[in-house]
A protein has these predicted regions:
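A short mid-domain helix/strand-loop element embedded in enzyme catalytic domains
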Residues: 1-5, 11-13, 44-48, 75-76
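Basic, Lys/Arg- and aromatic-enriched nucleic-acid-binding interface segment
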Residues: 2-29, 158-167
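Internal alpha-helical scaffold/solenoid segments in large eukaryotic proteins
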Residues: 6-15, 29, 70, 80-85, ...
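A short, glycine-centered helix-capping/turn motif at helix boundaries
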Residues: 12-15, 21-34, 105, 109-114, ...
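Conserved tyrosine-mediated DNA breakage-rejoining catalytic core shared by Y-recombinases
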Residues: 34-71
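Short functional hotspots where side chains directly engage DNA or cofactors
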Residues: 47-52, 147-200
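Active-site/catalytic core of tyrosine-dependent DNA strand-transfer enzymes
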Residues: 58, 63-158
């Protein structure tokens, strides 16, 4: 059963078409409203959705997981028209809750995939590319790959909450950074943990 609130709008109890797309992207509701038919791009062998003027007015590129590209492509027709109109959105649907669930799922996915040393190096390379191109505040301060061999350990209330909910409290730091940079457009691990991975 869904953790998300059902909408009072008839036919929009599941969040409508925006929620169908968002299960593959984990965007904020405001970002979904700005998407256009030409917001999908391909760069360095990967697929991204452009979020123009996202939170804080930032330009963002949200990575589409390789396994989800075919489904995401169905929503984009290459035109400059907006993907959704106001009536497509569920009035009481928790799109941000959907974003939290997506963050947990994508972090778990990377944790599993990053057990392969080759995948791990390629993932770090992609993080570095996006970091140096889009992180205006800390472009020159990405840690070396060896830094990410150290796990990110939840502490205090965050650890207690994770244990209570049966979720991991020792995280793969590279998987966490990939989730943060490539999928949430955050640049700090602690923000991602506090806002998405250790919250309900």
């Amino acid at each position: 059963s869904s953790e998300f609130k059902r909408s009072a709008n008839k036919g929009r109890g599941d969040g409508g078409k925006p929620a169908e797309l968002n299960k593959y992207l984990g965007l904020r509701e405001g970002d979904l409203k700005r998407l256009r038919g030409d917001s999908l791009i391909y760069k360095n062998g990967h697929c991204y959705v452009i979020v123009d003027k996202g939170k804080g007015g930032k330009y963002q590129e949200q990575r589409v997981c390789d396994k989800d590209i075919a489904e995401v492509e169905k929503f984009f027709d290459g035109s400059h028209r907006k993907l959704f109109i106001a009536g497509d959105f569920g009035r009481n649907f928790d799109y941000h809750g959907q974003r939290r669930e997506y963050a947990m799922n994508i972090c778990a996915y990377y944790t599993e995939q990053a057990k392969d040393p080759k995948f791990r190096k390629e993932l770090y390379k992609e993080i570095a590319t996006q970091w140096h191109q889009l992180n205006k505040k800390h472009r020159g301060h990405l840690e070396p790959l060896s830094f990410f061999d150290q796990p990110y350990v939840l502490r205090g209330k965050n650890k207690d909450l994770a244990i209570k909910q049966g979720r991991p409290w020792i995280l793969d730091r590279l998987a966490l950074r990939a989730t943060s940079v490539l999928h949430l457009a955050h640049w700090r691990d602690n923000v991602t943990v506090q806002s998405y991975l250790a919250r309900r």
